[in-house]
Amino acid sequence: IYNFLYLTNQGIDIVRIDAVPYIWKELGTTCRNLKQVYTIVRMMRMIAEIVCPGVLLLGEVVMEPEKVVPYFGTVEKPECHMFYNVTTMATTWNSIATGDIRLLKKQMDIVNQLPKQYVFLNYLRCHDDIGWGLDYETMRPWGIKEIPHKRYLNDYFTGKSRI
């Protein structure tokens, strides 16, 4: 909390919380989605609302948008203000490489069905690599196989192949 308050006092407007599901560690667990995570993020939101109400909490959760929903909290107990839309980033690059927007459209339709107060930050690149964690369950009936498809994407973006 000290660093959080220090940074907000320096004038930052957005605090990025990296790898939200893993911010609480406990031996003997996967350290993912432990109940303490929600308590910590809720506490940060409460502090922000009292001490620095103009500051937004931007979370990073590498999951599909519909699985990120619990990290927004509830109307009564809000947590993060917004989240990176990691899935759409990878799906956008997939659409560029393949010329196929079906998966991107499906994901945008899902996001558009979520409550309007759930805000996602769409972006095209970050400091991490692009993980090809695409929705292969949806893509399978379209004749797309995961391993060859990932190989194609890597080859495409390294200049080894084209559509």
Residue ranges, per PLM feature:
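Active-site and adjacent substrate-binding regions of carbohydrate-active enzymes
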Residues: 1-163
